[in-house]
């Protein structure tokens, strides 16, 4: 009988130790995420402009170019392709310009993913209200789903906390991946939007 009680006490001690370790681990993760969230929000708050090179992939088609972004809601991207394509947002409208074909397509910014991506306050609220959907050794990913069930995934470099790009679907339901390279924060942008 004594051996049986000793065995149960041993099991209880091990179980208690196990739950204590799990509790400490979860607490450390929450503290770590809180610091990460605070640092990411501070980085975004301090950012006024961004300039960067990009690689955009729509299904299997890749395009490259460079962009200038000025918060809130202003962006100008020049694609390095034969169509001489540009995307410009003036804060109200997004214009896709194809100089080679002399065509311009206009969209209200509110119906595009740019309304979230180019609005720093919306991104900060997304970070405050949501946990990342993924954190790996390189990236932190957040997901935003609007009222119409459109998804935008925004990602940041885990170490530098710099904006690294986004993923969404275009108006034809094609997967769009936009990756940022050679990012420069708070540089003087001389171009008018």
Q: What name fits each language-model region?
A:
Residues 29-31:
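N-terminal signal peptide c-region/cleavage motif recognized by signal peptidases
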Residues 1-14:
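N-terminal secretory signal peptides that target proteins for export/translocation
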Residues 100-139:
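Flexible, surface-exposed loop/linker segments and immediately adjacent secondary-structure boundaries
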Residues 14-25:
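Sec-dependent signal peptide recognition
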Residues 125-193:
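Gly/Pro-enriched, hydrophobic low-complexity segments
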Residues 42-62:
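A short, Trp-centered hydrophobic/proline-enriched beta-strand micro-motif
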Residues 67-116, 176:
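An acidic-aromatic
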